[in-house]
């Protein structure tokens, strides 16, 4: 992909303007504007993709934009997934720009390359690419119930599914089993891949799985969780919002439970 393009003043484009991992929003949306309508300098803009036949640009914010107009990407949950992911790409590239500005080999200053999304050392030419941390996320089913957990970091008190970072030398399936047992005391079986989602908080890739209960009683790790429960569809607490892979996993598990009940009733 060409990352630097000549901008046409009359061309409508989406502008992902980033400041401190937050995005510039107009009317709660990523701005779709012509360059001539913009009030800030766009010389450093990089094209990061296309959405609905319009280019999408990443741009670091400058001082002429009011800080009150910047919001976390969570404010965009529920918009079309393709545009949400492009906004995430912009925030991840911004994260790279600000956290990988020195070479990991020789310590020299690194700058953003002109021809790729990488930070290139000005002394030894080593290229550093955006760091992406692999994470698993899993919905566990026990007959007509789903395993849900509450985290202290969720100030709204929502319940979600189990997630965690993959360790070195570990398969994704091993990580699923380990994270579930470490956080809840539950052992699982029939672990199967479901889907994935880039998650720019700050720079993760969420790899989603479904699994079935095998054994054990819930015994939450209170360093990680504030609660863990088995919940039936009719008894769900507040859960992860739409637009998250966690919500997709919850909805899929509830659909599987409903389908199983339907077959049993035939």
Swiss-Prot record:
InterPro entries: NAD-cap_RNA_hydrolase_NudC, NudC-like_C, Nudix_hydrolase, NUDIX_hydrolase-like_dom_sf, NUDIX_hydrolase_CS, NUDIX_hydrolase_dom, RNA_Hydrolase_NudC, Znr_NADH_PPase
Xref: PROSITE patterns: NUDIX (PS51462), NUDIX_BOX (PS00893)
Cellular component per GO, a single term: cytosol
Cofactor or coenzyme needed: Mg(2+); Mn(2+); Zn(2+)
Reactions performed catalytically: a 5'-end NAD(+)-phospho-ribonucleoside in mRNA + H2O = a 5'-end phospho-adenosine-phospho-ribonucleoside in mRNA + beta-nicotinamide D-ribonucleotide + 2 H(+); NAD(+) + H2O = beta-nicotinamide D-ribonucleotide + AMP + 2 H(+); NADH + H2O = reduced beta-nicotinamide D-ribonucleotide + AMP + 2 H(+)
UniProt keyword Oxidoreductase, yes or no: no
A Pfam family hit: NUDIX
Residue positions of motif Nudix box: 164-185
Residues that bind a divalent metal cation 1: 163, 183, 224
Cofactor note: Divalent metal cations. Mg(2+) or Mn(2+). Binds 1 zinc ion per subunit.
Sequence positions that bind substrate: 74, 129, 197-204, 246
Keyword terms, alphabetized: Hydrolase, Magnesium, Manganese, Metal-binding, NAD, Zinc
UniProt binding sites for Zn(2+): 103, 106, 121, 124
Domain annotation Nudix hydrolase: ranges: 130-253
Segments forming a coiled coil: none
Record-level GO BP terms: NAD catabolic process; NADH metabolic process; NADP catabolic process
GO MF entries: magnesium ion binding; manganese ion binding; NAD+ diphosphatase activity; NADH pyrophosphatase activity; RNA NAD-cap (NMN-forming) hydrolase activity; zinc ion binding
Positions annotated to bind a divalent metal cation 3: 179, 183, 224
Positions that bind a divalent metal cation 2: 179
EC nos: 3.6.1.-, 3.6.1.22
Quaternary assembly: Homodimer.
Assigned protein family: Belongs to the Nudix hydrolase family. NudC subfamily.
Record's function text: mRNA decapping enzyme that specifically removes the nicotinamide adenine dinucleotide (NAD) cap from a subset of mRNAs by hydrolyzing the diphosphate linkage to produce nicotinamide mononucleotide (NMN) and 5' monophosphate mRNA. The NAD-cap is present at the 5'-end of some mRNAs and stabilizes RNA against 5'-processing. Has preference for mRNAs with a 5'-end purine. Catalyzes the hydrolysis of a broad range of dinucleotide pyrophosphates.
UniProt-recorded name of the protein: NAD-capped RNA hydrolase NudC
Organism this protein belongs to: Photobacterium profundum (strain SS9)
Gene name of this polypeptide: nudC
């Amino acid at each position: 992909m060409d990352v630097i393009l000549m901008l046409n003043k009359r061309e409508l484009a989406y502008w992902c303007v980033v400041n401190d991992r937050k995005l510039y929003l107009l009317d709660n949306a990523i701005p779709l504007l012509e360059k001539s309508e913009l009030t800030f300098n766009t010389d450093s803009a990089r094209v990061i993709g296309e959405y609905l036949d319009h280019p999408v640009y990443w741009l670091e914010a400058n001082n002429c934009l009011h800080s009150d107009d910047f919001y976390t990407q969570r404010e965009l949950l529920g918009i079309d997934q393709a545009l949400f992911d492009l906004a995430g790409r912009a925030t991840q590239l911004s994260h790279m720009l600000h956290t990988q500005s020195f070479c990991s080999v020789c310590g020299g200053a690194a700058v953003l390359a002109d021809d790729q999304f990488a930070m290139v050392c000005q002394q030894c030419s080593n290229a550093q690419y955006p760091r992406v941390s692999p994470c698993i996320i899993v919905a566990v089913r026990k007959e007509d119930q789903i395993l849900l957990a509450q985290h202290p970091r969720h100030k709204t008190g929502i319940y979600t599914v189990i997630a965690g970072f993959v360790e070195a030398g570990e398969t994704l399936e091993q990580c699923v089993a380990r994270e579930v047992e470490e956080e809840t005391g539950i052992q699982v079986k029939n672990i199967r891949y479901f889907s994935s989602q880039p998650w720019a908080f700050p720079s993760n890739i969420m790899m989603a799985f479904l699994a079935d209960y095998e054994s054990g009683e819930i015994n939450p790790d209170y360093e990680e969780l504030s609660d863990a429960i088995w919940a039936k569809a009719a008894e769900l607490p507040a859960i992860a919002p739409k637009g998250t892979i966690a919500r997709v996993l919850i909805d899929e598990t509830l659909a599987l439970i409903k389908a199983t009940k339907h077959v049993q009733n035939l």
